[in-house]
Amino acid sequence: MERIKELRDLMSQSRTREILTKTTVDHMAIIKKYTSGRQEKNPALRMKWMMAMKYPITADKRIIEMVPERNEQGQTLWSKTNDAGSDRVMVSPLAVTWWNRNGPTTSAVHYPKVYKTYFEKVERLKHGTFGPVHFRNQVKIRRRVDINPGHADLSAKEAQDVIMEVVFPNEVGARILTSESQLTITKEKKEELQDCKIAPLMVAYMLERELVRKTRFLPVSGGTSSVYIEVLHLTQGTCWEQMYTPGGEVRNDDVDQSLIIAARNIVRRATVSADPLASLLEMCHSTQIGGIRMVDILRQNPTEEQAVNICKAAMGLRISSSFSFGGFTFKRTSGSSFTKEEEVLTGNLQTLKIRVHEGYEEFTMVGRRATAILRKATRRLIQLIVSGRDEQSIAEAIIVAMVFSQEDCMIKAVRGDLNFVNRANQRLNPMHQLLRHFQKDAKVLFQNWGIEPIDNVMGMIGVLPDMTPSTEVSLRGVRVSKMGVDEYSSTERVVVSIDRFLRVRDQRGNVLLSPEEVSETQGTEKLTITYSSSMMWEINGPESVLVNTYQWIIRNWETVKIQWSQDPTMLYNKMEFEPFQSLVPKAARGQYSGFVRTLFQQMRDVLGTFDTVQIIKLLPFAAAPPEQSRMQFSSLTVNVRGSGMRILVRGNSPVFNYNKATKRLTILGKDAGALTEDPNEGTAGVESAVLRGFLILGKEDKRYGPALSINELSNLAKGEKANVLIGQGDVVLVMKRKRDSSILTDSQTATKRIRMAIN
């Protein structure tokens, strides 16, 4: 303080001012400090001082030819004196203005393409809507967010290869463009940037913005998709928030959102199939999101959602080491435990076998609407500090923490029996049983938990069993805080294993994820999700199952008809017929199947009594386990459009209608495709299929013994000849082919040759 006063006094004297402004600086240390090295020591001062000079800029000599010495106002634009120590010209800032107004223009066509992300951002802001500003306490928690809207999802290495290929195609160095997205982007960008005059380095920087996801760990209280993050500084402060609706969507946010929906649908569907893991993989590999293979997106996209992580684990990818319980992400921050099985009794005297975690541990819990810090010991909650958007969200977090603590008073609070099942009708494990029970009704849990008086701690208040705040007492060990708990910031990924029931474990055997953790929330995807797997046919309801089943048979008719005649059991077990069974009334499934299989067997024995259309029509019914009964049916019922509709065994119906003239099949009025061969040729279709792999040599030749039935053909050795009985009792001579390569053409030529041989 004294010093400052002294300085003020000194400054008020004119002599002091004179010394400071007029004296030259000649102290070596000072000169050294400001002149050594290339780094500017005081950029702001340097800039001010330079701009005060007449010619602060130096330019190449060529400038003299390109810029006049004076502008229209007669002001000098450059000096005739050379820049000291170089052969450059000294130039006035006015020359820059002149150049901008009168200098040569280049084509602007590439700017929107190179600076695409900026142009798009301007559009989003132009069309965005800013609402009112609200002043209130902001509970922000740090989350890893995407700060770069409109990017593809390439890894840094993949992007580097694309950028080198686009911007510096002649540079030496091996570049391997393997993924589909890399190739597409490279091709597209090369075309867009033909004859581009913008500095290559700039183009490279901008391409990087477009190709790579950039994430930062930022405090956020609202939306976390990249179109909200780009305006974070406009929408939330320490004590205020401004409502904002983005003026456009970007593909990367849409991909994230659609990926989560696809993954949830796939996990839910896989859970109910016979082999969940195999089904999940089959679905991931056959699904496309916005035209890109789901497995490619999973490899590149860092989204950390439960269903997405289960799919990643199944593909053998690393995932985050945090685990999920009750929709919250738990991350252990200190302590350790080992598990041991214990039997406990509920308030209803039901015995539960639970894996008890013994030892002291601390966790952060992060959910969509609430976060918490949990400290626990063996079967005991020591402290829980929660923060959340509203009472409901806070209650959700408290229930999850209380169940997770495995405390006895929680187990004793169970009223009634625990018998929750998952989608596949299997009982849930005990921890999830407890969770579901209290999520339905936590009243008894909160009442029995116990309350304690609390100290007055800044930023923390108590919460009563009915979830109202209090400054005097609180649920034992539980406090509500104004401050949120940050998400786990590390992006570290660990190797995990997955069992066939989709339970994901870390290398120590702790369960990180299971299908029970997958949210039941339904949403509408932003990008088109195409599930090619038959397991997902039912996602659009019974009609889609019906149409898809018949379309599948028609598309694969060539192979289906061979199996139909040679290996029907294998055909009936195909998973493509699984969804169809849900349409057939339960009581009738076995009877229908028995009836159709018998019918098919008669067709095989007495060739010539069937037509292709009828096989296609009845085939899905044969897939159910058959009941042996003598029942005959003239029509079969399927449950679509909320009621039973009939498929006629012989003839057309609104459900299944084949038009002989156009050879097209209509299912429930929707076109289901064309049959490529002519079903009117009676048996030719199946015979040519059966005779694939055989060459038809001509009419019967008695030297080769009695005529075999078509089913006996499979015993022939390659190159062996035999007579075979086909169609309406005709016999032809065939030879089993020596090679398999020509099999494909057989079915076409067989039909013609059979005709020739018979005639």
UniProtKB/Swiss-Prot annotation:
GO CC annotation, single: host cell nucleus
GO BP term, example: DNA-templated transcription
Sequence motif Nuclear localization signal, location on chain: 736-739
Keywords linked to the UniProt accession: Cap snatching, Eukaryotic host gene expression shutoff by virus, Eukaryotic host transcription shutoff by virus, Host gene expression shutoff by virus, Host nucleus, Host-virus interaction, Inhibition of host RNA polymerase II by virus, mRNA capping, mRNA processing, Viral transcription, Virion
Compartment annotation: Virion; Host nucleus
Keyword presence, Disulfide bond: no
Site positions for Avian adaptation: 627
InterPro entries cross-referenced by the UniProt entry: Flu_PB2_2nd (IPR049110), Flu_PB2_6th (IPR049114), Flu_PB2_C (IPR049115), Flu_PB2_CAP-bd (IPR048298), Flu_PB2_middle (IPR049111), Flu_PB2_N (IPR049106), INV_PB2 (IPR001591), PB2_helical (IPR049113)
Signal peptide: none
Location (main, coarse): virion
Keyword Calcium annotated: no
GO molecular function annotation: RNA binding; RNA-directed RNA polymerase activity
Subunit (UniProt): Influenza RNA polymerase is composed of three subunits: PB1, PB2 and PA. Interacts (via N-terminus) with PB1 (via C-terminus). Interacts with nucleoprotein NP (via N-terminus).
Chain's role: Plays an essential role in transcription initiation and cap-stealing mechanism, in which cellular capped pre-mRNAs are used to generate primers for viral transcription. Recognizes and binds the 7-methylguanosine-containing cap of the target pre-RNA which is subsequently cleaved after 10-13 nucleotides by the viral protein PA. Plays a role in the initiation of the viral genome replication and modulates the activity of the ribonucleoprotein (RNP) complex.
Family: Belongs to the influenza viruses PB2 family.
Designated name of the protein: Polymerase basic protein 2
Lineage: Viruses, Riboviria, Orthornavirae, Negarnaviricota, Polyploviricotina
